[in-house]
């Protein structure tokens, strides 16, 4: 079954296709764009990308946080220029979320913007990273600190790609699906994988349509991410993004409870949802809460103090100026486990 989800924006609206075999739509997408040349940047085997129908340069990429740096973007833009890519042509990404991030930023910067089409191959990229137009790379000081908003011309979420994923990579994507439970999605537990993807994308498309530039409602998509990003950095990215967001989601429930925004049943629901998906729910034993708090002060939402997206009587919303002692106390009360056991939890969980 194929689902088409429109992302309706004031400018640069596009469709997200979800289902088996949707990558075959790529030549038609390229034709509609009027491109004469294409650069395909792929972290997957060459035969994972169908022909574009135009003269094409294939560049090999590698997924992973170490590639999310400005030097990678510079290298890609240099290859675009050597190939003679024009502003009327197209760039195609094929890979996980780090690949769509880096390629999207390169497309945003080259000639001040060239069309980009994403073929996300991981569950994480299909449910979140490839949709919405956020592109970014990391700096030593923090995650996603340099970026741009550049909407794709199409996103083709071919669910056939997911059959090749290692179990841990599936769980990585489920971390984003789990957090959707608390920001307006229906209960996705027990749904088929294509249904989970389509529901997650539909939720995100609606939020992005209201707030493309992340000045209001789009903050909701950061549920669990404030601590999640800090955990990724503190563990040297030994925790995958979805794993860290899952722990951040449990923490968000506990923090909301500590602030009187949720009763105990609401706090417990966060843990139940995360555990249902087989995701980690404890802090790594060797991570210092003080380090996490310092890192969370660097979060883009922390304008005047610590800020978190938290559940409450009116639903999830951005809560600013959260007292650091309260945050530290909640972190201190979180269960702890070794990083090896936390990663082992996701390895052993059923997809």
From Swiss-Prot:
Gene expressing this chain: rifG
MF annotations from Gene Ontology: 3-dehydroquinate synthase activity; metal ion binding
EC number, as in UniProt? 4.2.3.-
Which GO terms are recorded in the biological process aspect for this UniProt protein?
amino acid biosynthetic process; aromatic amino acid family biosynthetic process
Record-annotated residues binding NAD(+)?
65-68, 97-101, 121-122, 134, 143, 161-164
Question: Which Pfam family is one of this chain's hits?
Answer: DHQS_C
What does the function comment of this entry state? May catalyze the conversion of 3,4-dideoxy-4-amino-D-arabino-heptulosonate 7-phosphate (aDAHP) to 5-deoxy-5-amino-3-dehydroquinate (aDHQ). Probably involved in the formation of 3-amino-5-hydroxybenzoic acid (AHBA), the precursor of rifamycin and related ansamycins.
Q: Which cofactor does it need?
A: NAD(+); Co(2+); Zn(2+)
Q: What happens when the gene is disrupted?
A: Inactivation of the gene does not affect rifamycin production significantly.
Q: What class of enzyme is it?
A: lyase
- Positions annotated to bind Zn(2+): 176, 225, 241
Query: Does the keyword Endoplasmic reticulum belong to this entry?
Result: no
Q: What is this protein called?
A: Putative aminodehydroquinate synthase
The entry's family comment says:
Belongs to the sugar phosphate cyclases superfamily. aDHQS family.
- Which UniProt keywords are listed? Amino-acid biosynthesis, Aromatic amino acid biosynthesis, Cobalt, Lyase, Metal-binding, NAD, Zinc
What organism is the protein native to? Answer: Amycolatopsis mediterranei (strain S699) (Nocardia mediterranei)
């Amino acid at each position: 079954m194929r689902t088409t989800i429109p992302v309706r924006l004031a400018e640069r609206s596009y469709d997200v296709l979800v289902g088996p075999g949707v990558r075959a739509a790529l030549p038609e997408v390229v034709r509609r764009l009027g491109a004469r040349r294409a650069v395909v940047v792929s972290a997957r085997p060459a035969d994972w990308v169908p022909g574009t129908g135009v003269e094409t340069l294939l560049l090999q990429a590698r997924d992973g946080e170490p590639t999310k740096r400005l030097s990678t973007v510079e290298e890609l833009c240099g290859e675009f220029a050597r190939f003679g890519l024009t502003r009327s042509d197209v760039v195609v990404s094929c890979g996980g979320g780090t690949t769509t991030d880096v390629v999207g930023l390169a497309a945003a910067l080259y000639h001040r913007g060239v069309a980009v089409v994403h073929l996300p191959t991981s569950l994480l990229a299909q449910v979140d990273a490839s949709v919405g137009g956020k592109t970014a790379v990391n700096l030593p000081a923090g995650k996603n600190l340099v970026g741009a908003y550049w909407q794709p011309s199409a996103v083709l979420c071919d669910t056939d790609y997911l059959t090749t994923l290692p179990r841990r990579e599936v769980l990585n994507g489920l971390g984003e699906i789990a957090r959707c439970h608390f920001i307006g999605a229906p209960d996705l537990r027990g749904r088929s994988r294509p249904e989970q993807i389509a529901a997650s994308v539909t939720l995100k498309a609606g939020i992005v349509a209201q707030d493309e530039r992340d000045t209001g409602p789009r903050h909701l998509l950061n549920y669990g991410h404030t601590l999640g990003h800090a955990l990724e950095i503190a563990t040297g990215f030994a925790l995958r993004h979805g794993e860290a967001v899952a722990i951040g989601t449990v923490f968000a429930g506990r923090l909301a409870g500590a602030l009187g925004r949720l009763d105990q049943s609401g706090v417990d629901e966060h843990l139940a949802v995360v555990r249902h998906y087989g995701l980690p729910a404890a802090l790594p034993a060797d991570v210092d809460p003080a380090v996490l708090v310092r890192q969370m002060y660097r979060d883009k939402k922390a304008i005047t103090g610590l800020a978190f997206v938290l559940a409450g009587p009116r639903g999830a919303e951005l809560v600013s100026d959260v007292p650091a002692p309260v945050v530290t106390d909640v972190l201190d009360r979180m269960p702890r486990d070794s990083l090896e056991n936390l990663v082992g939890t996701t390895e052993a969980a059923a997809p």
